[in-house]
């Protein structure tokens, strides 16, 4: 059965880069590139970057988690950018906007242009996605229905792991 990503723009800016469509992953790429939806400048040190999208992943008909990983273009001889946590792990129950913590290791600000791809999404279990489904901005979609995990951001579950008594 299929592995699918569902991407929903949540701002007008994002709608321009994510028009409603279904994209078949003919090349069988493991990662799904994610656009920056506006020009931005990353100052030296820690930066928070809004991606203006919600994302859900489904494998074999069941919602699953996914990873946010840096693309090789994120760190080049012109710029030294890294994800603050190395790899972002998104819980299956998270239904909020995707955001990044990016560290600019350089001494000068770095310009990022709209439509530049710094990160990619990889399904839990490293399953190759069959389709990337781009939804309408205000479309009601079951995989984005409220969950106990909700829309809280970075480390917001407030619990240390899953082992509880």
Curated annotation (Swiss-Prot):
Belongs to the dUTPase family. The keyword Methyltransferase does not apply. Coiled coil: none annotated. One of its GO terms (molecular function) is dUTP diphosphatase activity. Gene3D superfamilies: 2.70.40.10. Pfam families: dUTPase (PF00692). Keywords: Early protein, Host cytoplasm, Hydrolase, Magnesium, Metal-binding, Nucleotide metabolism, Virion. It comes from African swine fever virus (strain Badajoz 1971 Vero-adapted). The viral dUTPase may play a role in lowering the dUTP concentration in natural infections to minimize misincorporation of deoxyuridine into the viral DNA and ensure the fidelity of genome replication. It is found in: Host cytoplasm; Virion. GO terms for cellular component: host cell cytoplasm; virion component. This is Deoxyuridine 5'-triphosphate nucleotidohydrolase. The keyword Magnesium applies. Its EC number is 3.6.1.23. Induction: Expressed in the early phase of the viral replicative cycle. Its main location: host cell. GO terms for biological process: nucleotide metabolic process. Its cofactor is Mg(2+). Homotrimer. It catalyses: dUTP + H2O = dUMP + diphosphate + H(+).
